[in-house]
Design a protein with these regions (language model features):
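Short, solvent-exposed secondary-structure junction/capping segments
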Residues: 25-26, 61
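Thiol/selenol-based redox catalytic cores and closely related redox-interacting motifs
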Residues: 31-112
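Local sequence-structure signature of Cys/Sec-based thiol-disulfide redox active-site neighborhoods
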Residues: 1-18, 26-31
């Protein structure tokens, strides 16, 4: 099990705590330090069951607006996340072939 984690983020910490309380020790991926590449992002989309990259993006992030991404296509958005990982919504928990966004944190329980 993996968690794409940002330690300062309260939702990310709460999600990690939910896993730990269930005796799950996930591989913690600090995605700002080790950004996912485009293939990893595409794999995340499949596991999340989404077709639009925006569904896993922080669209309210100032950088999103600065880069003018509001009308960008999926490929452009994937490249933007790979280059600027702070645009990736967090946390994301991956278990086998499924993933869930921890917003709210309890949502990840569905794939445990």
């Amino acid at each position: 099990m993996d968690i794409y984690h940002k330690p300062p983020c309260s939702k990310s910490r709460q999600t990690l705590e939910i896993l730990i309380q269930r005796n799950i020790t996930p591989r913690v991926i600090k995605y700002l330090e080790t950004p996912p590449n485009i293939d990893e992002l595409k794999s995340l989309m499949v596991k999340l069951g989404i077709t639009q990259v925006r569904e896993m993006m922080r669209t309210k992030e100032a950088l999103y607006k600065e880069l003018g991404l509001s009308s960008a296509d999926n490929e452009t958005l994937l490249k933007a996340i790979a280059a600027h990982p702070k645009l990736l919504e967090r946390p994301i928990v991956v278990s086998n072939n499924k993933a869930k966004l921890g917003r709210p944190p309890e949502q990840v329980i569905e794939i445990l």
